Curated annotation (Swiss-Prot):
It is found in: Cytoplasm; Membrane; Cell membrane; Cell projection, Axon. This is Voltage-gated potassium channel subunit beta-2. One of its GO terms (biological process) is regulation of protein localization to cell surface. NCBIfam families: Kv_beta. The gene is Kcnab2. The lineage of its organism: Eukaryota, Metazoa, Chordata, Craniata, Vertebrata. It comes from Rattus norvegicus. It comes from the Eukaryota. Optimum pH is 7.2-7.4 for the NADPH-dependent reduction of 4-nitrobenzaldehyde.
Length: 367
């Protein structure tokens, strides 16, 4: 059995913090808990984001009701989370509508929120997708209308666009920032070379470079965030905002006995995830997760909490985006912050030994 202390009084983190602390609340017990500082700079920018953010992929406007979305967002905000991420493509724009309605209804100060959206797949027309100047400007305008906001804090290019010159994309991103439609811009699913090219173009033409890459990062996907992005961070200041810390639920342990009903892998359009889980590699991963479960029990936490804390222990990660379909999941995930101080070097080494997939940079080979 897991201990009931998942959402109890949190420990203070040894993170480099200077901003206002968030307040951890336990809705289960009703009383505000000790203040906890858990904000980090997004890359080398001055933007302070909570080390955990709430994503809206699959859930908002799709898997969950609008009422549940409001409940989850309120829980997140009350627990100090200030980062909320969406995209024009999520639920064909409905995720942005739901998010915008909640912000308007709750009356939260806009200046207390960090809202991010992603542009690439807008509509079915040829001109409604990609990273052309036309779609970046029109797509972001449409997103802002759905969100009922004057600006987003970060607009992301949701994937690279080989059909558009890099200079055009960087100029368009600079334009929307100069027009007050966004504060910063970033990339998602871009390679290190593509990010470096965008930075070089920005420097060459006195434009605004990206500050962050959104990348998939979890125990079974490590190379990009642990080897490639740290080099970019040190060279040009691009940070990492990571998503899918539980590998679409694989790391949660929920699939160790097959595909449960109402899980993401059971949804229409997620046959790829089901196939992945039931594959030979998927079975090997489940065996490793059983070993990791023993470490989680030793630390007094759940497997999802261990997995999220493991992502947070990476100093190059500015924020980890969470996905949740109910309040229990969200509060459990937020409880990962309490596990972070317990991840000693020996525990991390033990986890690496079980996973057997630690990537090595050129520096590691030289030393």
């Amino acid at each position: 059995m897991y201990p009931e202390s998942t959402t109890g009084s949190p420990a203070r983190l040894s993170l480099r913090q200077t901003g206002s602390p968030g307040m951890i609340y336990s809705t289960r017990y009703g009383s505000p808990k000790r203040q906890l500082q858990f904000y980090r700079n997004l890359g080398k920018s001055g933007l302070r984001v909570s080390c955990l953010g709430l994503g809206t992929w699959v859930t908002f406007g799709g898997q969950i009701t609008d009422e549940m979305a409001e409940h989850l967002m309120t829980l997140a905000y009350d627990n100090g989370i200030n980062l909320f991420d969406t995209a024009e493509v999520y639920a064909a724009g409905k995720a942005e509508v739901v998010l915008g309605n909640i912000i308007k209804k709750k009356g939260w100060r806009r200046s207390s929120l960090v809202i991010t959206t992603k542009i690439f797949w807008g509509g079915k027309a040829e001109t409604e997708r990609g990273l052309s100047r036309k779609h970046i400007i029109e797509g972001l305008k449409a997103s802002l209308e759905r969100l009922q906001l004057e600006y987003v804090d970060v607009v992301f290019a949701n994937r690279p666009d080989p059909n558009t010159p890099m200079e055009e994309t960087v100029r368009a991103m600079t334009h929307v920032i100069n027009q007050g439609m966004a504060m910063y811009w970033g990339t998602s699913r871009w390679s290190s070379m593509e990010i470096m090219e965008a930075y070089s173009v920005a420097r060459q033409f006195n434009l605004i470079p990206p500050i962050c890459e959104q990348a998939e990062y979890h125990m079974f996907q490590r190379e990009k965030v642990e080897v490639q992005l740290p080099e970019l961070f040190h060279k040009i200041g691009v940070g990492a905002m990571t998503w899918s810390p539980l590998a679409c639920g694989i790391v949660s342990g929920k699939y160790d006995s097959g595909i449960p009903p109402y899980s993401r892998a059971s949804l229409k359009g997620y046959q790829w995830l089901k196939d992945k889980i039931l594959s030979e590699e998927g079975r090997r991963q489940q065996a490793k997760l059983k070993e990791l479960q023993a470490i989680a029990e030793r630390l007094g936490c759940t497997l999802p909490q261990l997995a999220i804390a493991w992502c947070l222990r990476n100093e190059g990660v500015s924020s980890v985006l969470l996905g949740a379909s109910n309040a229990e999941q969200l509060m459990e995930n937020i409880g990962a912050i309490q596990v972070l101080p317990k991840l000693s070097s020996s525990i991390v080494h033990e986890i690496d030994s079980i996973l057997g997939n630690k990537p090595y940079s050129k520096k590691d080979y030289r030393s």
